[in-house]
Amino acid sequence: MSDLTHLDETGKARMVDVGAKDETLREAVVRGEVHMRPETLQRLAAGDMPKGDALATARIAGIMAAKRAPDLIPLCHPLLLTHVAVDVRLDAATSTVQIEATVRTVGKTGVEMEALTAVSVAALTVYDMCKAIDRTMQIGAIRLVRKSGGRSGEIVCE
C-alpha cells in the first residue's frame, strides 16, 4: 500500500500532505463526449433547445465545476486555479458533443481532478438541457488526455 499516497500505514484514507512539494506550473487536459440522436445534435447546432443555449450553459457549468472539485471529491486539495477553459463542439459524423477542459495552476499538486470534474459536469449539463427531446443520450469516454508539472513531468495518454 506504500505507493497509494491517499492511504496511511494502516490503510485508512487520508489527505496527502503536499507541504514539502515544490510549486510548479500544473496543467491537465481532459476530454469526454455525449452521444445523442442526430436530430438532437441538429437542434443543438440550430440553438433550438427548450431550455436555452445548452452549449454555452455547459461551458459555464464546467468552469464552475472545476472550481468546486474539492467540495465534491473527498480528500481533493483546494487549489488556486489560474486558468480553466471548457471547449464544447458538435461532431455530426459521430453525433456527439465533444467536450474538452484545460485547467492550470501554479501549485504543489496536479489539476486532473478539476479537469475531470469540469468535463463531467459539462456533459451532465448537456444531458440535462437535452433530455426533454432525447432520452437515449449517453455520456462517455471521459478521460485524461495529458497532464504536466510536478515530479511526474509530462504524461500523455492519447
Swiss-Prot record:
SUPFAM superfamilies, A to Z: Molybdenum cofactor biosynthesis protein C, MoaC
Signal peptide start and end residues: none
Enzyme class, UniProt record, top EC level: lyase
EC number per UniProt: 4.6.1.17
GO molecular function: cyclic pyranopterin monophosphate synthase activity
Bridged cysteine pairs (disulfide): none
Reaction catalysed by this enzyme: (8S)-3',8-cyclo-7,8-dihydroguanosine 5'-triphosphate = cyclic pyranopterin phosphate + diphosphate
Role this protein plays: Catalyzes the conversion of (8S)-3',8-cyclo-7,8-dihydroguanosine 5'-triphosphate to cyclic pyranopterin monophosphate (cPMP).
Family: Belongs to the MoaC family.
This protein's name: Cyclic pyranopterin monophosphate synthase
Organism: Roseiflexus castenholzii (strain DSM 13941 / HLO8)
Source species taxonomy: Bacteria, Bacillati, Chloroflexota, Chloroflexia, Chloroflexales
Gene name tied to this protein: moaC
